[in-house]
Each structure stands twice: as C-alpha cells, then as structure tokens.
C-alpha cells in the first residue's frame, strides 16, 4: 500500500493493538504529553468513545478511502455509534462551510452595491460643488451608520463562520487549543469527553466534561517513577467494550463476594469463557445460568483454566485459598497464570508469588479500587504488578471489568499503592462522618452542609453518596466497614515498616474500631458515623 500523507485535522481509521480499526481525528497532543520513542506516531482522538492515544502511522488509514471496507468488517453497536458520530461531525462542518459561502456572496453583493452608491454620490457631489459652494445636507444614502447596532436589513443574516473543514485541515500546533471547549456547539462538533485506550506510557483521564487544563495535562503525563513503574492506560468499559475481542484463554474466578460478582458478570457479558468457584456454592448458581462453568475446588479451576483470578476478603483468606486443602497451589502447572485481586499486605503477596512461581506458574497481583456499584458497572481501577506478560494476556479481561489499569512494576507495588489509596479513602470517610455529626450537635442542617460541600472543591460522587447514606440512615454495604478498617490497619503497618508516621490514619482506625464494637462491621463504611453518635 502506497504511503499516505496524514496531518493534523485529518479523519482516519486507527488500529490499536488487537482492537478493530476505529474512526478518529488526528489532533495536537497537550504540551506535557511526551511522544513515544521509536516509530513515527500521531495523536488521535477517537469518535464515539472520545478516547485519545498515540497511534503508529502504519496503523492509520484515511477515513473516506476505507469507510466502506471498515463498515463491512465491523458490525458492533459501539462501532456504529462511532461512525454515526463522524457523519454528524461532517454534516455540521458542511453546514458551516455552506453558511460561510452564503455569507461571503452576500458580503460581495453589499460591497458592490456600496461601491455603486459611492460612485453615484461622488458624481452628485461634484455636480453640486460646480453649481454652488454652499453647504448641503448629505443624502440618506450618504449618511454614516451608527457604530454598534447593525441596520435592520442585516438582522436576520447569519454571522460569517470559518469553515470547519478548512480549520481542521489547516489548524497548526500553535493554534490548536486546550482546554476542552465549554459551549454546547463545541462539545457537539469536537467533544472532549475523555476516556482512554490501553496505551503504554499514558494514564487514564476520567470522563469529566468540566475537567480543567491542569488536570488534563497532569493526568496525561507519562508516569515513570524511579522504581521503573509505568502506568498503562486501559479502555473505559463504557466506551468500546461492546467491541472487546475476548481472549481465547479459559478464565477461572475464585470468590464471588461484592466485588467478584460484578467482575464475573462483566467477563461473561463480554464473551469470556469463565469457570467459577466460591466457598458457598450457592453463589455460583446465578453465574452458571449466565453461561459460566462451575469448579468443585480451587485446584480444579486452576488446572482446567489458563488464567485464574481470585478476589477474597483479607490476607488470611488469600493464603488459605492458595495453600489450603485442594487449594490453588495443587492445580498450578508450568505456564498456568494466577492473578490475585485481593487487597492484602506486600508481605502476603510476595509469599503467594514465591510459591506460585516455584511450581512453574506465573503470578500477577491486581487489586482493584472501587466499590460494588463500580464493579457492577465495569468501572473499576485495576492496579497490577508482577509478570507483565500475564498483565498483557489479561487485557481483554481488564477491559471488561474496569475503566483503567496501571502496571506498577515488581510484585508488592500494587499492594502498597492499594493500601495507600484505601487509607486516604477511609480517613476521608471518617472526616465526613465527623463533620456531619458536628453539624448536628451544633444545630446546623446536615443537608445544608452537604449542599455546600457539593458546590465546593470537595464535591464528588463518593462524598455525595456517603452523606446520603448518613442522611437516610441507609448503610447497605457498598464497601464493608470491616474491610476498610482492615486496610487502614495494614496501611499503618506499612508506615511502621519504613518508619513513616501515619497519625491521621491511626486516628481514623480507632473510630472504625469503635464502629465495629457497635456491630457495624457488615454495614457500609459510612456506618462509621454511628461511632460518633453513640
């Protein structure tokens, strides 16, 4: 195929990894986003999903020249929505181009008319001057227009607009502007709703139309720390998971709790072959109805599957699952992959990795950040570390269950990062509860406090949901209180191991311990509120 010259503003088909070609537009990347080394790449914004990614030039094809070919090859719903978005974009651009041409011809007509009037006026002026030198009133045609409001005749004429097609083709790097547009027209023609494709060296940007320039550039920066860890971007499951190509590997899943149930459901929806096991077998029934197979023991699941995921409550449960009778270790053979998604301490995950690898297995830790709702929605954040080959083999699984994933390097790094995240979340929840109770005892409206918080810098879905739980007295578990307390305890121990103070986490931990003493362990973490009112 002959080389095609592509430039900023061109519409293209972009091929990313194992995913189908997707319609997009070549755009200028933010200044802080470094270009990948090696082969020539262009920065592409994809339609429909509004993902952004660096794509190798050889993986790009002109949109119009290959449109029929691509539409015949791909029939997914998300794909068709993306094509519709391109056509809508072109339709609007064509309308703007037509408006410009119409206004251009009107302007020429007005200029010609004005010129004729000017010449007539000149003749009249000269004639008048030759017959008399006395001052005369100017004719109505010669009267100067007032500055500001245009004459009535121009009222209904659309204002000239630059050609969108030409703007897209000719826009230079210096003229291409971030941040995202704020008007409805801009969002309609060049939407910056942000998701992400799985791309080495870039982070996921959360979908937030009002996101600031600083937030965009900060999140797009390549995250490559001194430890050599690299963040890896994954596709938003709401964006293109309708077109995920599921791996042909057999998937096993151990543990069908709050998080595991949502994960397995999404794996099945996206066409993966899944075998499940749970300590209480009844929990498997629903997934068997959805097409899953059932394993009698963890060892059986591991021995019959290529990649086995596990998501259990704590370090003890994680060890028992691997080392106990009919456990994972008994089913491990050379080449078998084991992915532990539990939130545990670095020492536990290192021990599990060692025993798995000693049997010829391959190990990846991949704890998840999120709650039951995010698990059900396929919007988890996955933190992975260990065998990078396993991480890549799990790509379609991670796309099904999460909105983004990060590969953080060697075993233990994901456990550390997960504990730090949950330490921050748990401490924040305790502070929310403390503020709500303080408002109550000082005679302030808790609802008004929430309304004010929702209008400020702390506004978030997490804040609103947890405060609503408190206001309604509804503590149905979305994230068990006993588990956030466990994570706080492990985070404090992590701080102790490196002689780092964690006084805020320690104080929050004591409040959660009091809530547990009040029989709140199996309620949502927001039930920590009750520790302040008893």
Curated annotation (Swiss-Prot):
Compositionally biased residues, Basic and acidic residues: 93-122, 138-157
Keywords noted in UniProt: Chromosome, DNA-binding, NAD, Nucleus
Gene3D superfamilies, per the entry: 2.30.30.140, N-(1-d-carboxylethyl)-l-norvaline Dehydrogenase, domain 2, NAD(P)-binding Rossmann-like Domain
Protein localization: Nucleus; Chromosome
Location of the region described as Disordered in the Swiss-Prot/TrEMBL record: 93-168
Pfam families, sorted: NAD_binding_11, NAD_binding_2, PWWP
PROSITE patterns listed in its UniProt record: PWWP (PS50812)
Residues holding NAD(+): 252-266, 343, 486
GO molecular function: DNA binding; NAD binding; NADP binding
Span list, region Interaction with histone H3: 190-193
DNA-binding region residue numbers: 144-156
InterPro entries xrefs: 6-PGluconate_DH-like_C_sf, 6PGD_dom2, 6PGDH_NADP-bd, GLYR1_PWWP, HIBADH-like_NADP-bd, HIBADH-related_NP60_sf, NAD(P)-bd_dom_sf, PWWP_dom
GO cellular component, one term: nucleus
Keyword NAD found: yes
Region (Dehydrogenase domain): 242-534
Entry similarity comment: Belongs to the HIBADH-related family. NP60 subfamily.
Protein task: Cytokine-like nuclear factor with chromatin gene reader activity involved in chromatin modification and regulation of gene expression. Acts as a nucleosome-destabilizing factor that is recruited to genes during transcriptional activation. Recognizes and binds histone H3 without a preference for specific epigenetic markers and also binds DNA. Interacts with KDM1B and promotes its histone demethylase activity by facilitating the capture of H3 tails, they form a multifunctional enzyme complex that modifies transcribed chromatin and facilitates Pol II transcription through nucleosomes.
Protein name, per record: Cytokine-like nuclear factor N-PAC
Organism: Xenopus tropicalis (Western clawed frog)
